Design a protein with these regions (language model features):
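Protein kinase glycine-rich loop
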Residues: 11-17, 22
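Activation-segment/catalytic-loop signature of the eukaryotic protein kinase fold
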Residues: 74
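Activation segment signature within eukaryotic-like protein kinase domains
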Residues: 115-116
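Conserved catalytic-loop aspartate of Hanks-type protein kinases
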Residues: 192
């Protein structure tokens, strides 16, 4: 087994992306399991990937929230053969991703809504810090026995910052990109809210709100056709369906904020979520109720309470 800087013993590779690997590891100093993300060995040492993984560490380290996988450390190891490798040490979230659960079909609407409430709460914490995730999707949502963990702020960026990629290239997953992202507009929290709408739609139906066979066809359909309306789902509160529709609005100004979405979705399943103390006053187009308004006003250190139905447990 390899050890990074004499401290982090890499035990098992648990994920591989286009520019990085994630390993289950062991912190030999603090005597605990951790996750380590590092640039994939064998990739050429270009500044872009290195800068992005450093940015991920800095962005995620600013977030202290129960639905965000916390960052413990960042470094550059000289012990990897061939070249120095930057790495991030993160909380090891035990469970399965939402993508894995959705392979079996749609979730019960109560579970889907609760999952998305916790995702929205994580986004609200990020947005309160001026951070846009930019890659909200089922593969980046981990379902653990204790609740949801939003993973991989690897392409996160400060709200309003231009995309660092070359002209004509956009980072993100095509099905979850907001219309303005396709036009290379600066990242804003509203882009994350579009992705949340797709995530909610997919969790409720196990399909995307667009019909396409390939990624290129998907991008073409995205530009020519609006998202398909959410089908009728027995028992689903109408305000949840309306929220999903609002999140998928072409106009970013018509989408609800992450704070409003988190509170509305939590109310729909009688759950509670951690939300930022600072309450945005703009772009509150989603319907709210007295409970939601009261919760927002009183949310100083909200307690996360697990209500039935429980999240799917790790298999």
């Amino acid at each position: 087994m390899r050890t990074l800087d004499g401290r982090y013993r890499l035990e098992q590779r648990i994920g591989v992306g286009g520019m990085s690997e994630v390993w289950r590891a062991y912190d030999q100093v603090l005597d605990r399991p951790v996750a380590v993300k590092l640039i994939s060995p064998g990739r050429d040492d270009r500044d872009g990937p290195v800068d992005r993984i450093r940015a991920e560490a800095r962005s995620a380290a600013r977030l202290e929230h129960p639905n965000v996988a916390s960052v413990h450390d960042f470094g550059t190891s000289s012990t990897w053969p061939g070249r120095p490798v930057p790495y991030i040490v993160m909380e090891l979230a035990e469970g399965e991703t939402l993508a894995v659960h959705l392979r079996a079909g749609p979730l019960d609407w109560r579970i889907a809504v609760r999952v998305c409430a916790e995702v929205a709460a994580a986004l609200a914490a990020a947005h309160a810090e001026g951070i846009v995730h930019r890659d909200v999707k089922p593969a980046n949502v981990m379902l653990t026995p204790a609740g949801v963990k939003v993973l991989d702020f690897g392409i996160a960026i400060a709200a309003g910052e231009p995309d660092p990629m070359p002209t004509g290239m956009v980072l993100g997953t095509p099905a979850y990109l907001a219309p303005e992202q396709l036009d290379e507009a600066p990242a804003t929290p509203a882009a994350d809210m579009y992705a949340l709408g797709v995530l909610l739609y997919y969790s409720l139906t196990a399909r995307l709100p667009y019909r396409a066979a390939t990624a290129s066809e998907l991008l073409l359909v995205r530009r020519r056709q609006p998202p398909e309306p959410l089908p009728d789902i027995a028992g689903l509160p109408p305000e949840v369906a309306e929220l999903c529709h609002s999140c998928l609005a072409d106009d970013p100004e018509q989408r609800p904020t992450s704070l409003v979405a988190a509170l509305l979705l939590a109310e729909a399943v009688d759950a509670r979520v951690y939300v930022p103390m600072t309450i945005p006053t703009s772009r509150r187009s989603a319907p709210t109720s007295p409970w939601t308004e009261r919760a927002a006003a009183e949310a100083t250190e909200a307690v996360a309470v697990a209500h039935e139905p429980n999240l799917p447990s790790a298999r």
